[in-house]
Amino acid sequence: MSKEKFERTKPHVNVGTIGHVDHGKTTLTAAITKIMSKAHGGEFKDYSDIDNAPEERERGITISTAHVEYESEARHYAHVDCPGHADYVKNMITGAAQMDGAIIVIAATDGPMAQTREHILLSKQVGVPYIIVYMNKADMVDDEELVELVELEIRELLDEYDFPGDDTPVIFGSALKALEDDTSDIGVPSIIKLVEALDTYIPTPKRDTDKLFLMPIEDVFSISGRGTVVTGRIEAGIVNVGDELEIVGIKDTQTTTCTGVEMFRKLLDSGEAGDNVGVLLRGTKREEVERGQVLAKPGSIKPHSKFEAEVYILSKDEGGRHTPFFNNYRPQFYFRTTDVTGACQLPDGVEMVMPGDNVKMQVELLSPIAMEDGLRFAIREGGRTVGAGVVSKVAD
C-alpha cells in the first residue's frame, strides 16, 4: 500500500496573536484550536502545551514560539504565539514567523497598554499587512460604555500607525469562556466570528511562484563556449529560457538574457521559486557578476544604499556584543548572500544601544544592494552575528 499523498486543498495563511502581557493571547490561541478542531478536524492544544513553547534559534537568536495549526471552512492556518514580550520583538524582526495577518488581543478591562502600542508599531515596521482585534475578558466588564470607549481607543491607535482603524474587525468575547465551551455570545460564537473575520478580512497571500522573478546570486562560473552561469536558489517567481533579466546591486544595473536553466545537471525550460538552479547568461562576462547581486525581472527591484530599519541587537547570552554601541557604528550588513559595510545613525535622543535592545535606525551602505521594504538582514562583526533587522523604508 503506497503512502497517501498529503493533499492540501485549502489555501494556506500564516497568522499570530500579538498584544500586551496577560491580556489572554495564549488562552485565545488554545480556544481557537479547540473550537476549530471540533468543527474541521485537527488537534486541540491546551494552554500549557502552548505556554511551554520550545526555544528555537533563528539566526543565532533564541526565541520561544508556539506553533499551532487549525482549519476553517475555507483555509488552513498556521498560527504563532509567543510567551514573552521579547520573543515577539525578536520574532517579528527576524521574520522567523512571517505573518499574513495578526490578531491583536486586548483585555476589555484594561484597554490598550504599552505593549499593545509597541506590537502595532512593530507590525507596521516589519510589514504585517492586516490586523484583527479580539477584545478579550468580556465576561469581566458590565459597563457597555466602557467597552465602546476601549473600542474607540483601539481604532484610533490603529489609525495612528496607518492601519485602517474604521474598517478593522473588532470581535468582543471571552477566550476563557470559549475554552470552557460556553455557548453565549461571548463564548464559542465569538471564536467562530473571529475565524470568519480571518477568512474574509485577510486576503489569500500570493504564492511565491506568482511573484516577480528574483534570485540572489551565490556563485558565478564561466563555462567555455557557453558563457557565464550564476547559481542560487530562486526566491520568487519563475524564469524561462529566453527571458530578459537584470543583474542588480553592488555595481550599476546590467541587462542580460537567460539562455539556459540547469538543475541537478539537467537542462530545463524554466526554474521556479524554491529551486536551486544554475542560470546561463548571454553576453555577460564572468567578472561583471558577483555574489551578493540578484538576478531579477527588469524594473522589478532597485539598488539602494540608504534605508530605515527596525533592528534587534543580540544579548551577551545569545553570543552578541558585550558592550553598547554608539552613533556612527559601522558593522557589516548581511543581505541574502553577502556582507556590506554600513554606518548607523541612531534616532534623536538615543545615545547608545545596549545588547538585548531593539531600536529604529538609519543606515547608509558603502555599496548599494537590491532591496525593498520588508527585506530581512543580519548585522555582523567579522562573520559573527550581533543583530537582526528588517528594512522598514528604503530612502534614496
Swiss-Prot record:
Main localisation = cytoplasm
A single MF term (Gene Ontology) = translation elongation factor activity
Assigned EC number: 3.6.5.3
Gene3D superfamilies the UniProt entry points to:
P-loop containing nucleotide triphosphate hydrolases (3.40.50.300), Translation factors (2.40.30.10)
Annotated region described as G1, given as residue ranges: 19-26
Stretches assigned to the tr-type G domain = 10-206
Report the InterPro entries cross-referenced here. Answer: EF-Tu_GTP-bd, EF-Tu_GTPase, EFTu-like_2, EFTU_2, G_TR_CS, P-loop_NTPase, Small_GTP-bd, T_Tr_GTP-bd_dom
Answer yes or no on keyword Acyltransferase.
no
Q: For binding GTP, which residues are annotated in this chain's numbering?
A: 19-26, 81-85, 136-139
UniProt region (G4), positions on chain: 136-139
- Which residues lie within the region annotated G3? 81-84
Domain of life of the native organism: Bacteria
Q: Which NCBIfam families match?
A: EF-Tu (TIGR00485), PRK00049.1 (NF000766), PRK12735.1 (NF009372), PRK12736.1 (NF009373), small_GTP (TIGR00231)
Query: What interactions and quaternary structure are annotated?
Result: Monomer.
Physiological role: GTP hydrolase that promotes the GTP-dependent binding of aminoacyl-tRNA to the A-site of ribosomes during protein biosynthesis.
Q: What is this protein called?
A: Elongation factor Tu 2
* The species this protein was found in: Ruthia magnifica subsp. Calyptogena magnifica
